[in-house]
Amino acid sequence: MTQALPRVVTIRELLEAGAHFGHPTNRWNPKMKPYIFTARNGIHIIDLQKTVTGLSRAYQFITELTARGEKVLFVGTKKQAQEAVMEEAVRSGQFYINQRWLGGTLTNFATIKRRLKLLSDLEEQRDRGDFARLTKAEAAKLEEKIVRLNRVFAGLKGMDRLPGAVFIIDPRKEELAVREAVKEGIPIVAMVDTNCDPDPIDYVIPCNDDAIRGIRLMAGKIADAAIEGTRRREMSQE
């Protein structure tokens, strides 16, 4: 017997978040046709029933994934996504990239791990007071290095292996992240607007990926799923 999908969002919530507004009809990807309800005033309107189903499938997947002890990497570097991506990843104890995708983050993870270790070691030395034994210029140089590394790697601290999944806001913008995840066989959950190619995405959530409220709603639901999965794992280990 197939397990019923969790119903985690209502049509009303989606409407209030503006999730149904796609891109102008002349800027669409024909592969998104199954997810489009109609066109109004030259704008594609997303079929929100498909959004409900897509989010439910993604929620179930993320819950099961985190219940196995896997982690999710939230990715959203466009301005309107940065805050929600960071806050929801932190709230749910997951990882995030919200500034710039560094090429090789997934496909050259050994190098990324070395950079993360360097950042961790420098912060440890600073917190231990080791910098006090250096000249002012040397200490300032290392502080600047910490700031620089944090700018890129703050959301990846503690990530010692590849994530079990990536959650992407706007796969068109995050094309490199999509390519790397596909290459590494990492499942992709994504908010997919009418101008995107849904083919590389394992869990398509058809949705306006430009509206801040819509982004926050979706990131929040994926974070809730991760929290639920983590809670299940903790309960099973008691």
Curated annotation (Swiss-Prot):
<keyword id="KW-0689">Ribosomal protein</keyword>
<dbReference type="Pfam" id="PF00318">
    <property type="entry name" value="Ribosomal_S2"/>
</dbReference>
<comment type="similarity">
    <text>Belongs to the universal ribosomal protein uS2 family.</text>
</comment>
<dbReference type="GO" id="GO:0022627">
    <property type="term" value="C:cytosolic small ribosomal subunit"/>
</dbReference>
<dbReference type="InterPro" id="IPR018130">
    <property type="entry name" value="Ribosomal_uS2_CS"/>
</dbReference>
<protein>
    <recommendedName>
        <fullName>Small ribosomal subunit protein uS2</fullName>
    </recommendedName>
</protein>
<dbReference type="GO" id="GO:0006412">
    <property type="term" value="P:translation"/>
</dbReference>
<keyword id="KW-0687">Ribonucleoprotein</keyword>
<dbReference type="InterPro" id="IPR023591">
    <property type="entry name" value="Ribosomal_uS2_flav_dom_sf"/>
</dbReference>
<dbReference type="InterPro" id="IPR005706">
    <property type="entry name" value="Ribosomal_uS2_bac/mit/plastid"/>
</dbReference>
<dbReference type="GO" id="GO:0003735">
    <property type="term" value="F:structural constituent of ribosome"/>
</dbReference>
<dbReference type="InterPro" id="IPR001865">
    <property type="entry name" value="Ribosomal_uS2"/>
</dbReference>
